[in-house]
């Protein structure tokens, strides 16, 4: 089959590899190169790097809404377009251009967590399971019928980064299964999404990563896990702003104001929350690298009462 692949971040790379394994990927669409790093030089997306390494033609339009962009898609004469975390809206004309339309690999069990950040929002909400859906795309935001799906459990201490990697691999497998069926002349049965159970995974930003100690410790611990490795939770601890890379909630009754340091040891730094306490295990000072609580205490000799 002739396939157009559209994707941008690391999450999409395993799916591109799966598509290219037994099919002809005639073109890759990805976001334009963006400034990144200390030098702010233009940096290609992970998907572009993979496509270039495979010798696949790369297209990086600012939009797919122009007549020129549509003409290019049609000229590729594709059987199918596969979209994985691309980042641009596909107009109806593009969705209809390939023979079999457009498939999307989405990192949630739809209709739960439609939108941009389903992995992080699932952890933040305390979901115990999630998965991947292969969806036939339509004009709405992640509203199309589901062709195939797989579910997995979310680990009790699993971070957003760890779950991201597992779902990226699972998404590639689900896509491979779907492409195998289509190649054999079997079109997966499209199951409409139910009207109930719809939630939206709004895009992450750094402002959401600022923790408020007045919130319950369980909620804060989930946010620390969800926002690792990006945007990384941050809070005021012992008078300075730090980033939190690892923490667990403690069911601890106390009468202390939120933000009070309750105890500190090699096991972690315990901070009073609106309910319970948060034990910070790995943190990062401004301008520094991530360190253990023990190393942080060694650097903060001004906290003798907590040792």
From Swiss-Prot:
Keyword Protein biosynthesis: yes
Keywords: Protein biosynthesis, Transferase
Catalytic activity: L-methionyl-tRNA(fMet) + (6R)-10-formyltetrahydrofolate = N-formyl-L-methionyl-tRNA(fMet) + (6S)-5,6,7,8-tetrahydrofolate + H(+)
A Pfam family the protein falls into: Formyl_trans_C
Residue numbers binding (6S)-5,6,7,8-tetrahydrofolate: 108-111
Enzyme Commission number(s): 2.1.2.9
GO molecular function: methionyl-tRNA formyltransferase activity
Database matches in HAMAP family: Formyl_trans (MF_00182)
Xref: NCBIfam families: fmt
Known function: Attaches a formyl group to the free amino group of methionyl-tRNA(fMet). The formyl group appears to play a dual role in the initiator identity of N-formylmethionyl-tRNA by promoting its recognition by IF2 and preventing the misappropriation of this tRNA by the elongation apparatus.
Protein name: Methionyl-tRNA formyltransferase
Source organism (scientific name): Xanthomonas euvesicatoria pv. vesicatoria (strain 85-10)
């Amino acid at each position: 089959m002739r396939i157009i692949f559209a994707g941008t971040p690391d999450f999409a790379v395993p799916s591109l590899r799966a598509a290219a394994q037994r099919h002809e990927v005639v073109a890759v669409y990805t976001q334009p190169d963006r400034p990144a790093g200390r030098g702010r030089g233009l940096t290609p997306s992970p998907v572009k790097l993979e496509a270039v390494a495979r010798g696949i033609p790369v297209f990086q339009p600012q939009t797919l809404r122009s007549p020129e962009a549509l003409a290019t898609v049609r000229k590729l004469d594709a059987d199918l377009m596969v979209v994985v975390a691309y980042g641009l809206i596909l107009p109806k004309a593009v969705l209809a251009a390939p023979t079999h339309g457009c498939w999307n690999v989405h990192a949630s069990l739809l209709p739960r967590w439609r939108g941009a950040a389903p992995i992080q929002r699932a952890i933040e909400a305390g979901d115990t399971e999630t998965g991947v859906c292969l969806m036939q795309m339509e004009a709405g935001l992640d509203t199309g019928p589901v062709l195939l799906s797989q579910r997995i459990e979310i680990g009790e201490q699993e971070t957003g980064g760890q779950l991201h990697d597992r779902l990226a691999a699972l998404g590639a497998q689900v896509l491979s299964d779907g492409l195998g069926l289509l190649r054999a002349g079997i079109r997966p049965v499209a199951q409409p999404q139910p009207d109930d159970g719809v939630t939206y995974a709004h895009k992450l930003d750094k402002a959401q990563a600022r923790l408020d100690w007045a919130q319950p410790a369980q909620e804060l611990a989930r946010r620390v896990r969800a926002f690792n490795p990006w945007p990384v939770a941050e809070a005021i601890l012992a008078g300075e702003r730090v980033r939190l890379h690892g923490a667990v909630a403690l069911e601890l009754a106390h009468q202390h104001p939120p933000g009070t340091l309750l105890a500190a040891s090699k096991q972690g730094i315990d901070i009073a929350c609106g309910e319970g306490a948060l034990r910070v295990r790995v943190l990062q000072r401004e301008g520094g690298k991530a360190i253990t609580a023990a190393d942080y205490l060694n650097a903060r000799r001004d906290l003798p009462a907590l040792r």
